[in-house]
């Protein structure tokens, strides 16, 4: 069935650079068609220095929202009217929701992870959590676990480009959720004996 776009069609997008390889437009547009939703999803190649303009255009065109990918996640967070609790701690976003001109930035990786655990009968409240890695998704998972009541989070990461960020994330969580014990360890310092 051919997609008909009208003056009532809601617009959603992906912003970042590069985005030409993204499968998101095909995935979302297929889903909208199957669900009978009057939306269209496109990808805009937006370099970091144009994020402010892109977000202003989002309001101007009354776009319902967008996904944000690298390298725009930190820059986009600066122009939100509101940030979710996890996005406040991390200082980056991957989703923008436009609610009548009010833009709220979210970081959804951790929310999705914790929601999936709950769907499988696992409640993290009061639990000890171990996370391997300190990249973007791992950071979001650590933060969301702390926000959702994990008692202790231990992060293991090799001393690479993400390690300093791993230590910073641990400190941010300690400040935002002081009841959660946060530990970060350099994997290169851990020796396993046989």
What are these regions (language model features)?
Residues 150-173:
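NAD(P)-binding Rossmann-fold cofactor-contacting core
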């Amino acid at each position: 069935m051919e997609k008909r776009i009208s003056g009532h069609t809601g617009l959603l997008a992906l912003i970042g650079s590069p985005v030409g390889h993204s499968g998101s437009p095909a995935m979302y547009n297929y889903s909208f068609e199957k669900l009978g939703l009057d939306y269209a999803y496109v990808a805009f190649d937006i370099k970091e220095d144009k994020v402010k303009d892109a977000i202003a255009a989002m309001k101007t065109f009354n776009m319902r929202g967008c996904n944000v990918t690298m390298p725009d996640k930190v820059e986009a967070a600066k122009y939100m009217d509101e940030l979710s609790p996890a996005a406040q701690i991390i200082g980056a976003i991957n989703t923008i929701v436009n609610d009548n001109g009010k833009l709220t930035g979210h970081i959804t990786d951790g929310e999705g992870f914790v929601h999936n655990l709950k769907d499988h009968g696992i409640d993290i409240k009061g639990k000890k959590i171990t996370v391997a890695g300190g990249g973007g998704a791992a950071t979001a998972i650590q933060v969301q676990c702390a926000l959702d009541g994990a008692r202790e989070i231990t992060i293991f990461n090799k001393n690479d480009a993400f390690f300093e960020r791993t230590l910073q994330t641990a400190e941010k969580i300690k400040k935002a959720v002081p009841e959660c014990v946060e530990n970060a360890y350099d994997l290169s310092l851990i020796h396993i004996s046989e």
